[in-house]
């Protein structure tokens, strides 16, 4: 349609054909590997194409991550990861805190002895409170808090995302989801004045024409805290239970 061509021409003029916006929105490509790109497009593509045998992950602990929508255009996402494989990803819009909590509870009941991590910043605090009132063993995650490695990372969000980066590069099997893959390959990083790793803010991603990385954030939440090895069956190296 002519209107589509006009819109594409406007995007070309406003953002440029080499911009992340144009590559993701128009060409359906991952951004090129750049000096500020946290997770390479090639690592994401390989993880998307890989299929692990159940024996490679079914004895590993299960982690559930819930990123709660903050704005109308954002998604609430519940993602389930078992070791090196993503088991499921569900997205929702326009749910209140109680409804989100009920969805989390339903997913939790499906998986035995899973660890449940919920973003407790903003509206997420109500979800965490509701789950706690129902006696679910939820862990509220405030990504702005101090990380375990305070020398290397600016905050917990940077630490979570970097753990996820290392996981993505370790022979994993991620779900075949275009939006998740685009979000993983689009995030950028930098350094604080004290040389700590910082992850790009959602507001800065929007300035680049990209949407809030809600699905990737849900995956990152599963790396908020290392799951104790006593929750695993069999013998594994320390890196295996991230």
Which residues does each PLM region occupy?
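ATPase catalytic-site recognition across NTP-hydrolyzing enzymes
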Residues: 1-66, 80
């Amino acid at each position: 349609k002519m209107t589509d061509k006009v819109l594409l021409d406007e995007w070309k003029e406003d953002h440029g054909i080499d911009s992340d916006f144009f590559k993701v929105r128009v060409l359906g490509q991952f951004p090129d590997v750049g000096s500020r790109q946290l997770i390479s497009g090639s690592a994401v593509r390989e993880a998307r194409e890989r299929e692990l045998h159940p024996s490679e992950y079914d004895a590993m602990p299960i982690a559930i991550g819930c990123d709660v929508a903050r704005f109308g255009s954002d998604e609430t996402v519940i993602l389930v990861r078992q070791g090196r494989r993503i088991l499921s990803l569900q997205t929702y819009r326009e749910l209140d805190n109680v409804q989100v909590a009920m969805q989390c509870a339903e997913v939790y009941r499906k998986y035995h002895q899973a660890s449940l991590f919920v973003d407790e910043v903003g509206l997420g605090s109500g979800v965490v409170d509701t789950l706690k009132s129902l006696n679910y063993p939820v862990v509220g995650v405030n990504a702005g808090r101090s990380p375990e490695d305070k020398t290397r990372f600016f905050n917990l969000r940077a630490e979570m995302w970097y753990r996820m980066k290392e996981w993505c590069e370790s022979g994993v099997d991620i779900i075949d989801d275009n939006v998740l893959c685009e979000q993983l390959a689009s995030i950028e990083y930098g350094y604080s004045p004290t040389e700590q790793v910082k992850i790009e803010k959602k507001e800065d991603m929007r300035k680049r024409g990209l949407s809030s990385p809600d699905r990737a954030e849900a995956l990152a939440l599963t790396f908020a805290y290392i799951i104790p090895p006593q929750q695993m069956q069999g013998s594994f190296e320390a890196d295996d239970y991230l």
